[in-house]
Amino acid sequence: VLALGTASRTILTKEERCRVLEEMGGDVLLECPLTEKIRHMKAENFIKEILIGDLQVSYVAVGEDFRFGYERKGTPAMLKEFGKKYGFHTEVLPKEMDGRRKISSTFVREELNRGNMEKFRFLMGTDFSVEGIVEHGRGMGHKYLLPTTNLIPPVEKLMPPNGVYITVSHFRDRSYQGITNVGHKPTVGGEKFIGEEPVSYT
C-alpha cells in the first residue's frame, strides 16, 4: 500500500535524478542552491561568477528553450556569445518531439495524471517507478492468505491516478511480480491509511 501525499508533484525525486545521471555516465554532480543572491543574479553575472569564476567551464550543454538568470533573461544565444569571449563551447540540444508536440515535463505529467503508463514509458524511456518506506498494516492480507506490502512514497513524488496496476517490486536482490492498488484499501472499508490515501501491491 502506497500512502499518497497531496504535495506529490515531481516526476523524479532528487535521488532518482542523481541515479539517472550516474547511470548516464556522470562523474560529479554539483547543485547550486537557490539563495536570494542566486535568485536575483543577472544572467551575465551568473556566467561570469559561477560558470567562469567558480567552475571554470570549458563546455556547456543546454536545451534550446533553456532560460536562466534573473527574470529568465539568459538564453542559449547569450551562452554562445560569452563562450566565444571567455573560451568555452556551448552546445544547444534540440527538443525531442512526439509527432508535432515537444516532449516536456508538462507533457509527461499530463500522461501520468491520465494513467497512460505506456505513453509515460515512451516519453521517459523507462517505466514509472517509486521508492518508499515500508509501513506495517493490520495484517489483513496474511489473514486471507494474500499478504500485502504497505509503502509510503516520497511526498513530492507525482503518482498515477487511483487504480490497479501490474507491477514488479524490487527488494534487496530479488524481484516480485504483483498487483498494485493505488488509492483506498478496497478490502478494509476504503478508509485512509495513516491519514493519507494508500496504495497496495501483493
Question: Over which residues does each language-model region extend?
Answer:
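Phosphate/ribose-recognition catalytic cores of enzymes acting on nucleotide-derived substrates
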Residues: 137-201
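Generic anion/oxyanion-binding catalytic loop in active/binding sites
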Residues: 10, 35, 97, 109, ...
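Core alpha/beta nucleotide-donor-binding catalytic domains of modification enzymes
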Residues: 1-55
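Glycine-rich loops and low-complexity Gly/Arg-rich segments
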Residues: 14-19, 53-57, 85-87, 115-118, ...
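Classical nucleotidyltransferase
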Residues: 40-147, 162, 170
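Short clusters of hydrophobic/aromatic residues that line enzyme substrate/ligand-binding pockets
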Residues: 2, 134, 151
